[in-house]
Amino acid sequence: MASYGFPLTASSLVDWTSLTFSPIEVNGHIQCTYSPEVAEWGAPHFVKDPYLRVHGLAPALNYGQQIFEGMKAFRTPTGSIRLFRPKMNAVRFAHSASFVAIPPVPEALFLRAVHLAVGLNSEFVPPYDSRGSALYIRPIAFASSATVNLAPADHFTFCVFVMPVAPLSTGAGQGLRALVVEDVDRAAPKGTGSAKVGGNYAPIVTTMQRAKADGYGLTLHLDSATHTMVDEFSASGFIGVRVDAGKTTMVVPDSPTILRSITVDSMCRIAESFGWQVQRRAVSFTELAELSEAFAVGTAFILTPVRAITRPCTHTCIEYTADYRSSASAYTRLLETLQGIQQGWLDDAWGWTEEVQDPSSDEFITDTVQARR
């Protein structure tokens, strides 16, 4: 532990009881640049200003040449700070980069930047007793040089931003209502569905807003080729659980157009440890009526129960009557196990968590630009 007592305790300037999922100002972010002169990513800079200086003709702004990630850091009972499966985020970040001609960020640099971003903002990691709250981590990379024609960019920027957050959704107690999206497809069969790029998300915002106005907390996508198979929710993965004659089976849609969710993978591993059967396969929409429980799963949503799924074109409404508040529900068992591992009150049998390193031992560069007020 460093002489100044790393990690710092949770800041008294933050009202930890009223966190949302909206950004609040922190100490700064980590930033790296890639230039053709050296053909590699440069050293990390700690930048206090949350605003980025980007040319208006940058391909990221004009052609959507950008990628992002989502991950979290948690404070443990001993006061240390843990990351959850960060190497999987590094792998997925490189996978996304391959779709949009961005030089891959080496795993070592990705992890170093994440450790620095969290470590230099350690007082913004929520207290251990604020269950469900965490420091949200948003790595991004984008083409930042000025390029008008659709051609390879020269310069790229990689950043890691952080902010303390509460869970995006608590599931409204007994679950959210989901609407099957019928007016727009999320991803084409040979498209970018497995990459975390903005183009997979921006087109669905209007549909999500309309659904919310109609009382739906989630929007569910079917495959774009036949509209018969379940893909995923607009901003999270799908998991279903079926209990039949005392046997529990977890079903997870498997398709090349689905984002490889780290939280979904973790839930599958946890389910297997319970002795449940886990099936990663194509899941038809009609099969949803056979499920006992259904969830939206992701870094932001964590594990959010679904109360009903409505499909207007067939006048179908599938309802789930499980008591999600029951300690015996699949929802409660999965959620408590995941959060217990993430926050350190259960043993990490899989070695998923990684303790954040003291940034004082890293020779990063500090930017002198102050944050704008």
UniProtKB/Swiss-Prot annotation:
GO terms for molecular function: branched-chain-amino-acid transaminase activity. Pathway: Mycotoxin biosynthesis. Induction: Expression is up-regulated more than 10 fold in toxin producing cultures. Its cofactor is pyridoxal 5'-phosphate. Its EC number is 2.6.1.-. GO terms for biological process: branched-chain amino acid metabolic process. Gene3D superfamilies: 3.30.470.10, D-amino Acid Aminotransferase, subunit A, domain 2. It comes from the Eukaryota. Keywords: Aminotransferase, Pyridoxal phosphate, Transferase, Virulence. Pyridoxal 5'-phosphate binds at residues 92, 232. Gene clusters encoding host-selective toxins (HSTs) are localized on conditionally dispensable chromosomes (CDCs), also called supernumerary chromosomes, where they are present in multiple copies. The CDCs are not essential for saprophytic growth but controls host-selective pathogenicity. PANTHER family: AMINO ACID AMINOTRANSFERASE, BRANCHED-CHAIN-AMINO-ACID AMINOTRANSFERASE 3, CHLOROPLASTIC-RELATED. Transaminase; part of the gene clusters that mediate the biosynthesis of AM-toxins, host-selective toxins (HSTs) causing Alternaria blotch on apple, a worldwide distributed disease. AM-toxins are cyclic depsipeptides containing the 3 residues 2-hydroxy-isovaleric acid (2-HIV), dehydroalanine, L-alanine which are common for all 3 AM-toxins I to III. The fourth precursor is L-alpha-amino-methoxyphenyl-valeric acid (L-Amv) for AM-toxin I, L-alpha-amino-phenyl-valeric acid (L-Apv) for AM-toxin II, and L-alpha-amino-hydroxyphenyl-valeric acid (L-Ahv) for AM-toxin III. Belongs to the class-IV pyridoxal-phosphate-dependent aminotransferase family. This is Transaminase AMT5. It comes from Alternaria alternata. The gene is AMT5.
